[in-house]
Amino acid sequence: MRRITLLTNPDKCNLNCPLCFLNQRGFSRCVLGVGEMAFETARTAIEKYAAERNASGKRVLREVIPSTMGEPLLYSHFEDLLSLCRSMELPLNLTTNGTFPGKWGCEAGMELLLRSCSDIKVSCLASEQFDGWKANVEKLLDVRQKLMADAAQGGDAANSMLNARALGIATVSLQVTLHKKNVDKAAELVSWASSVGINRIKWNPVVLLSTASQQLREMYALDDAQIESLRQELRNGALSASNVKHEGSLFFNNGKVFCAVGGKCESCPFADEVWVWPDGHEDHCPDPERRWSKVHT
């Protein structure tokens, strides 16, 4: 497997975002009830896939992703996970809600994350719940700029920014859930991202589960014209910045259904990835409707 995602703490979060798949299910936020992943479960999964080699003897596993449901920095064993991956020279691909709780909000904590991760994605889904996320991103980027300058041995950190990974320092991305309330702010977001040094924006049109309420749909659902308009503006450069990459499900061939490839597993861009649940069982399909709409209801 190229990447593994550990669902370390899907029920543990410090925010309550309305578009979270657990909230869309129409039940209380913590009904998933699967608990936290024991560290030994995480270790076993990582060591299992880290042992895989390709025909030339090179390790196949490139990175580990801690929970993308819940806030991974609240995982009780996050520091242990970080230490294990560092010892195995496996970078983490981190997605956080931007609150940077506890030690992770201080300069030393951010420096450790930047040295240990391949990419740090800050989800803009939390923007309605937490208005301090931009300030935290700017602080993270300030810490990275200092690291880049040191790594470049006094060279021009700005010119080295695009080579962050080559210097062993994480890139910083935004993960944007596009919906009715924020689609008209895309240009403003791109401008800010470019000015502060964001490397990439992942644009993902909102996915509403079949269990989502009508009220939620009326508040957040996008129509096809809005999605297509933004897609074209980003593709033709009208809404782009030369120093920011644009990726995400907005650019998938078929973004109108839950599965972006229409259920054709042989075309799935995630075919060489696996998701490990807290109890250790494995899941190979990322379709949110299948995964979240009926689990433990």
PLM regions and their residue ranges:
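Conserved alpha-helical substructure of the radical SAM core
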Residues: 1-111, 115-119, 155, 219-225
